[in-house]
Amino acid sequence: MFRKYLTITSLFAIFFYSLYSQADNIFSNFFGKELDVAPVKNSLYLEECGDCHFPYQPGLLPARSWQKMMKNSSLQDHFGEDIVFDEQQIKKQLLNYMITNAADNSPFKRSRKIMKSLSYNDAPLSILKTPYIRRKHSDIPQRLIAQPEVGTLSNCEACHKKASKGNYDDDEIHIPNTNLRYND
């Protein structure tokens, strides 16, 4: 009898440990603490993209957008910058990371909402061009966006203090110089 309980307890412990160790979000989801998008943990992506701008999580755009963005013609005018990689292998590794973690390949809630807002062939090059993100920011007065602490909606971390951790939750929004909160 003791052996049976020991076996069941061991299997239960192994099951929960495997949930915890296999993916950051599975264990958290079990307890209702789901992240919005997968945080960026890829050192190459952080170095190559994060050196110039906030390293936007791949889960904020579909794979087709990342593929379009990484084409040579798009890289020649990447939001006003000419992007050149020292090696083609770097470009391939970055694209692979982006596609693997893109919104259409992600189980995270914000990624799913972004995908639901897009039509089948939409491939926006900017996160701000996705209908979901546009809707979420539509009620924010321009004067709050234009203030020096924010400057532009592409400055996610100005208001989303935990953006780098993949948390864009409404409860974590702090618009500089206000006590305002914007919710769904």
Model features per residue range: what roles?
Residues M1-T9:
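Bacterial N-terminal signal peptides that target proteins for export
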Residues F16-S18:
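N-terminal signal peptide c-region/cleavage motif recognized by signal peptidases
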Residues D24-G50, P55-K92, N96, A102-D184:
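Sequence context surrounding c-type heme c attachment/ligation sites in exported
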